[in-house]
UniProtKB/Swiss-Prot annotation:
Gene3D superfamilies in alphabetical order: 2.40.128.20
Short sequence motif GXWXGXG: positions: 20-26
Family: Belongs to the nitrobindin family.
Protein name per its UniProtKB record: Ferric nitrobindin-like protein
Source organism of this protein record: Streptomyces avermitilis (strain ATCC 31267 / DSM 46492 / JCM 5070 / NBRC 14893 / NCIMB 12804 / NRRL 8165 / MA-4680)
Amino acid sequence: MIEIPSDLHKDLVPLAFLLGNWAGAGVHDFPGSEKCNFGQEVSFTHDGRDFLEYHSHTWVLDADGNKVRPLETESGFWRVDAARKVEAVMTRDDGVVEIWYGELAAKKPQIDLVTDAVARTAAAGPYSGGKRLYGYVKSDLMWVGEKQTPEVELRPYMSAHLKKVVTPEDVERWAKALPDDMPDDGIAFFK
């Protein structure tokens, strides 16, 4: 279910499907890097201004699904305009800052992004650009990332399937929103 908070900036309504905390797992595979399964936690939040705040933490998983070590951390800010053009600024822990542009699909909650600019610190590894696809599918958030370096052409390197995380605060908010005249047996929901 996509919930649109009453204090969400009006320009961000098309991105409301991203809001919340997400967790799941995926696959990482790129030449010169360790191929592995990874766990991921993502949050998209807002404070009433015209952008979403984004945070992602990934970690390598062992064969039993246990956390082994951090893989990648990134954070950033996402905006969308009236023409459904999306811009994102993201910073990664490996010393890369990216500006992404793309668009929100016309009839489905899907975002295609492409890097417009990449800045790297001296500590960053080779990286020259990428693409990302985010989609809201059957109440889950799925994404795939592609990247390129001077040595490797653009290719997929990470993808994940994330589920919405329900917090105690969510349950409390939903409970407060229930109608006062709800029947004791709850059957009315199914009639």
